[in-house]
């Protein structure tokens, strides 16, 4: 068969890289005008961000002075044609008209501004520039929303970015020059607040709309990917790149020129010859293949050094094409990185290796489609490949096989068209990827070039005249736990994320000044956890080691799982000055727990960039003075320092005082004295509004009815590196019922009716610190604050002054007013916040009732603790509306409950007093009634404990409304126990001290039951327990035993003397009558027999039935878990209150029986013996009571 080597080459079609496209049948010429304008604007923002007339003229020259209605229309068409969606005519016309109007008014404003610059003291020029600013500002506030009309946000996005940039520029003017124009300080500050708010608002809209536009596109075929990538690229150039510079308009953060960099990558169209109108996408890679093969994963910023291309060929017609390649790049400060082979390492020709000694700013490529005739009957073979590329650098060109016609400058035009492209280029080549697909009968291969903006410098050089912004992706090493992730859209590139504490990244910097110079730095970051960042300089080339130069807190800015937005990103303050160790130097950055090793590490830290500025003595003094002035002025409600702001805490004032104290006497002595007087005035105002007595902890328990009351283990300590004044330490406690506590009552006379009050303070560290505010009910919070450990850098011990005091001017972790915790209306206080607040509402006040308000701090476990100070209790605001109605309702409910409590108390007190009085012979309460037994005392005690509100349930040392009557009766109960114990001659008869005082034969146990009672257990018949007891011959005694018999046999308690006179009590687990020797009686007729003793002794279980809830009809089935019917004061909020006195006596379970007998000894010694015949005998108590004469 004869081979036909003829083939047809189809040239690259314009529709693969269109300069004009068809939309709805209409031919619209677009070119790249919107991209040209945007690139020129970005170049201007990179190099000329200094405010003033020059900046405004630049905006006119690059945008607003050259763009008319047709150009604005081209901005809209640029996106419309990609998303195949037209803006509604009304919206289009309104947007173009508004843009034209804004441009006209901006030109007038610039004229007025330039006139004022030339004659700044002329009232006429000042008035005119204010008028023109206000007109333009109002138009922008009105018109910018028209550039985000619902449904058309994506095609309007590029003009939205231009208008937003203009608005931020003039707002910055008003903040910088406003007071010189004649605006008030209040007006300037209001404009600054709007500037900050709009920076976030505009940046977030740009990023969110960008993502929404991409998400709305189809994602199936190769052509879908082409559209997707073009939209991604064009919106990056015309929107996101501009939005990345929005934060630089914050002139208070950037008082001098910042040096911004764009590290993001954009991708030009694949070098694949394809005509979507004539050819099928079946021979091309799918959307997913393109996205996974052509687009690189997020990575550190790298620089292209070498490209080696491997040439392949197709046998039919011997057609050579780009078959694969390898890229060698480098990281700034790091070594070379060799990529894996893209495509195939073919060897049909020797590999072409190109080492570029400069940036590749342009490629001219030749992608081809060859229709190759194969031997019959095979169909023609479609071969798509790249047959040649020319790479251009500013000084040279490098050619692979041949030069093509597909020019990268048509997609990424120069940023400056006034000079040749080798000087005015906007992007440089940074990488190349490869895509392919094969089948029958076709083979498709293509190269995709990625590009980075030229603003991303090839070194991290510190310019001493500017604020140097260095994206952290320009480091050379990230450590385990750190990853590079796709940026949120408004950062100008990818960012770093770390999900655990540890080393973050290492980067190399070059210093363009003497090595002895000192610098400051700060971070732009977002974090869902509190952390501390440590910067080491002089690290090894691996990024390990070095000396700590910066140690500063990064406070939480977002919640876990929250999306990254411009609002979630914050800046730290500039650090204390530090020096580099070498030139170039290695910076190591790590993240550590903010509060020490025990801190919770859940959450993530994201860092966008580090910013470095030169610092000198004058700069430091001016910076410190500016910061101190700002902090002092922020304390007051107005410039005349009449009143403090409500949110200014006492701790805050102390920290501001430290700032003032640390100002340089050499550079700003007069200013320091003035600020010191102001901050002292602020401290006095703070003391005046604080309703707490002795807020500085001069003493505890100094006065019975005033100031702080607390447990004896609390310590007061002097100021340290955290507190300027005294603070208290609350240690743990070994018994929950005896907590460590600190409390104070706010007198009723200090409170205003229907007002909200706030308790707040500063906690250095705490574990389960309980905080209460109590009036009608309790507001309660449990606060955990891991300790800071130390505020000083890790490289040095806490410095001290010449007299041993903390040196608060030494470099340390700086105070951050944003570290706050607010607990309002029952909300849970966030953990790990040093500042706490707790609110409570007060209804009507009554000086006669003197209810007042209790402030309580409590620690109730051994391992817990707290250190706190700067406590304040102050009036917050009058109650209105719903809050007023709520407190009135709470007050009414409280009064209703108080009335019910009073009625209940009258009844309960009467019953309790009668029970207590019945124990004694007379009203002197010095002798017990003859028939008073332990059960009767328990029963009386039970009734006393039914008196509610004897003590506050939150802290039982604070008396409640019924404290006086409770303590009166409880004291008599205590007396009854003492008299009863004096009358019982058996020692340790309740076995609470084990077998102390008892003689033991055989195996016996003392067990603590579930009701916390100790019982004697005799499990074997040969065992015996006995005790010798001294008695008075001729006197009568009562032997009383409470016991339980388990199983067969009998349990016996015998009393006898040496020779005779023996008596015993027997216990069995049966219902048959038992015959007792001598004067004993059966279980069933014992009560009747007792009547013979003229009522002196009543039922054997008198008192016990009530105190223990005993029921003789319950079967004697021994239960290991007692069926408690415990008694308390009926409130149950405080389980420890019943421990006061003997109120914790617990009842016996069912099955226990109490028996007694009379005994008249003839000698001075008797023996009590306990034993059993079979089974198990359990004895609760043995008593031998002397009868009254």
From Swiss-Prot:
InterPro entries tied to this protein: Cry1Ac-like_dom-VII (IPR048645), Cry_V (IPR041587), Galactose-bd-like_sf (IPR008979), Pest_crys (IPR038979), Pest_crys_Cry1Aa_dom-IV (IPR054544), Pest_crys_dom-III (IPR005638), Pest_crys_dom_I (IPR005639), Pest_crys_N_sf (IPR036716)
GO BP term (any one): symbiont-mediated killing of host cell
Family matches, as Gene3D superfamilies: Galactose-binding domain-like, Pesticidal crystal protein, central domain, Pesticidal crystal protein, N-terminal domain
Gene Ontology MF annotations: signaling receptor binding; toxin activity
Keyword tags: Sporulation, Toxin, Virulence
CDD domains per UniProt: delta_endotoxin_C
Role description: Promotes colloidosmotic lysis by binding to the midgut epithelial cells of many lepidopteran larvae including Spodoptera species.
Other information: Toxic segment of the protein is located in the N-terminus.
UniProt record similarity statement: Belongs to the delta endotoxin family.
Name this protein carries in UniProt: Pesticidal crystal protein Cry1Ca
Organism annotation: Bacillus thuringiensis subsp. aizawai
Gene: cry1Ca
């Amino acid at each position: 068969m004869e081979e036909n080597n003829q083939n047809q080459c189809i040239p690259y079609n314009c529709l693969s890289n269109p300069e004009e496209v068809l939309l709805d049948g209409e031919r619209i010429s677009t070119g790249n005008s919107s991209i040209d304008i945007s690139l020129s604007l970005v170049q201007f923002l990179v190099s000329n961000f200094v405010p003033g007339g020059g900046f405004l003229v630049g905006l006119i020259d690059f945008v607003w002075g050259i763009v008319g209605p047709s150009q604005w229309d081209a901005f809209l068409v640029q996106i419309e044609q990609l998303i195949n969606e037209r803006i509604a005519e009304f919206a289009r016309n309104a947007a173009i008209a508004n843009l034209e109007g804004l441009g006209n008014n901006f030109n007038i404003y610039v004229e007025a501004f330039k006139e004022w610059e030339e004659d700044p003291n002329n009232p006429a020029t000042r008035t005119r520039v204010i008028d023109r600013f206000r007109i333009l500002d109002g138009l922008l506030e009105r018109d910018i929303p028209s550039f985000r009309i619902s449904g058309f946000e994506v095609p309007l996005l590029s003009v939205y970015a231009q208008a937003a940039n203009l608005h931020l520029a003039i707002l910055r003017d008003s903040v910088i020059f406003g007071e010189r124009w004649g605006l008030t300080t209040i007006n300037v500050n209001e404009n600054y607040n709007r500037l900050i708010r709009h920076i976030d608002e505009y940046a977030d809209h740009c990023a969110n709309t960008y993502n929404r536009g991409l998400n709305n596109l189809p994602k199936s075929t190769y052509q879908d990917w082409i559209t997707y990538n073009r939209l991604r690229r064009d919106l990056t150039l015309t929107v996101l790149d501009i939005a990345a510079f929005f934060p630089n308009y914050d002139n208070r953060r950037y008082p001098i020129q910042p040096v911004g960099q764009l590290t993001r990558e954009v991708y030009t169209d694949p070098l694949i010859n394809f005509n979507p109108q004539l050819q099928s996408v079946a021979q091309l890679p799918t959307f997913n293949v393109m996205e996974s093969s052509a687009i690189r994963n997020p990575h550190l910023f790298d620089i292209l050094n070498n490209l080696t291309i491997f040439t392949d060929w197709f046998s039919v017609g011997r057609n050579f094409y780009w078959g694969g390649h390898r890229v060698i790049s480098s990281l700034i400060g790091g070594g070379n990185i060799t990529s894996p082979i893209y495509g195939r390492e073919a060897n049909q020709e020797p590999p072409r290796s190109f080492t570029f000694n400069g940036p590749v700013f342009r490629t001219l490529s030749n992608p081809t489609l060859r229709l190759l005739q194969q031997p019959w009957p095979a169909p023609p073979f479609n071969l798509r490949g790249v047959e040649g590329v020319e790479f251009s650098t500013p000084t040279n060109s490098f050619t692979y096989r041949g030069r093509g016609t597909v020019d990268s400058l048509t997609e990424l035009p120069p940023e400056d068209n006034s000079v040749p492209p080798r000087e005015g280029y906007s992007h440089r080549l940074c990488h190349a990827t490869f895509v392919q697909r094969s089948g029958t009968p076709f083979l498709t291969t293509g190269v995709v070039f990625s590009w980075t903006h030229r603003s991303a410098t090839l070194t991290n050089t510190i310019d001493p005249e500017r604020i140097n912004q260095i994206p952290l992706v320009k480091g050379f090493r990230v450590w385990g736990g750190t990853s590079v992730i796709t940026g949120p859209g408004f950062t100008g590139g990818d960012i770093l994320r770390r999900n655990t504490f540890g080393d973050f990244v290492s980067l190399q910097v070059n210093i363009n000044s003497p090595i002895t110079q000192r610098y400051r730095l700060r971070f732009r970051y977002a974090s869902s956890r509190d952390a501390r960042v440590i910067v080491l300089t002089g690290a090894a080339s691996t990024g390990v080691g070095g000396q700590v130069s910066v140690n500063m807190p990064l406070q939480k800015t977002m919640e876990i799982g929250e999306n990254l937005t411009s609002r979630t990103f914050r800046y730290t303050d500039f650090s204390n000055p530090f020096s580099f160790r070498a030139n170039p130097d290695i910076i190591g950055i790590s993240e550590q727990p903010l509060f020490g090793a025990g801190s919770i590490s859940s959450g993530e830290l994201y860092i966008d960039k580090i910013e470095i500025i030169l610092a000198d003595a004058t700069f430091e003094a001016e910076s410190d003075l500016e910061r101190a002035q700002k902090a002092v002025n922020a304390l007051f409600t107005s410039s005349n320092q009449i009143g403090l702001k409500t949110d200014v805490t006492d701790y805050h004032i102390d920290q501001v005082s430290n700032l003032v104290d640390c100002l340089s006497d050499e550079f700003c002595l007069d200013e320091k004295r003035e600020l010191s007087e102001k901050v002292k005035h602020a401290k006095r105002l703070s003391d005046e509004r604080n309703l707490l007595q002795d807020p500085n902890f001069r003493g505890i328990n100094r006065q019975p009815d005033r100031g702080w009351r607390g447990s004896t283990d609390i310590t007061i300590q002097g100021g340290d590196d955290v507190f300027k004044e005294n603070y208290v330490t609350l240690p743990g406690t070994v018994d929950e019922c005896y907590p460590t506590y600190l409390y104070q009552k706010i007198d009723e006379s200090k409170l205003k009716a229907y007002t909200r009050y706030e308790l707040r303070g500063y906690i250095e560290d705490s574990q389960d610190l309980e905080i209460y505010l109590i009036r009608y009910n309790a507001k309660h919070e449990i606060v955990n604050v891991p300790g800071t450990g130390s505020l000083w850098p890790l490289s040095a011990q806490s410095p001290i002054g010449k007299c041993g005091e903390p040196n608060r001017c030494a470099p340390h972790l700086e105070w951050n007013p944003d570290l706050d915790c607010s607990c309002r209306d029952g909300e849970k206080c966030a953990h790990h916040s040093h500042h706490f607040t707790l609110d409570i509402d007060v209804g009507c006040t009554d000086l006669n009732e003197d209810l007042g308000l209790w402030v309580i701090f409590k620690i109730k476990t051994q391992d817990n603790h707290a250190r706190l100070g700067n406590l304040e209790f102050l009036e917050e605001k009058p109650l209105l509306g719903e809050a007023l109605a709520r407190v009135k309702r709470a007050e009414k409910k409280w009064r209703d409950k108080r009335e019910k409590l009073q009625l209940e108390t009258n009844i309960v007190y009467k019953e309790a007093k009668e029970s207590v009085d019945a124990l004694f012979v007379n009203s002197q309460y010095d002798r017990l009634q003859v028939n008073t037994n332990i059960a009767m005392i328990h029963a009386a005690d039970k009734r006393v404990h039914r008196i509610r509100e004897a003590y506050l349930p939150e802290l039982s040392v604070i008396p409640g409304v019924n404290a006086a009557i409770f303590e009166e009766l409880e004291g008599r109960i205590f007396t009854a126990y003492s008299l009863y114990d004096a009358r019982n001659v058996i020692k340790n008869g309740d076995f609470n001290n084990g077998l102390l005082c008892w003689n033991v034969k055989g195996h016996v146990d003392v067990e603590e039951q579930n009701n916390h009672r100790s019982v004697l257990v005799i499990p074997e018949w040969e065992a015996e327990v006995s005790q010798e007891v001294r008695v008075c011959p001729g006197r009568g005694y009562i032997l009383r035993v409470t016991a339980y018999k388990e199983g067969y046999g009998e349990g016996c308690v015998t009393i006898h003397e040496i020779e005779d006179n023996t008596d015993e009590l027997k216990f069995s687990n049966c219902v048959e009558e038992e015959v007792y020797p001598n004067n004993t009686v059966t279980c069933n007729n014992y009560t009747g027999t007792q009547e013979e003793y003229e009522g002196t002794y009543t039922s054997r279980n008198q008192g016990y039935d009530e105190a223990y809830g005993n029921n003789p009809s319950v079967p004697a089935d021994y239960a290991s878990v007692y069926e408690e019917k415990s008694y308390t004061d009926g409130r149950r909020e405080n389980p420890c209150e019943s421990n006061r006195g003997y109120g914790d006596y617990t009842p016996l379970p069912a099955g226990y029986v109490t028996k007694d007998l009379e005994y008249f000894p003839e000698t001075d010694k008797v023996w009590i013996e306990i034993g059993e015949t079979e089974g198990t005998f359990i004895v609760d108590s043995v008593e031998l009571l002397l009868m009254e004469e």
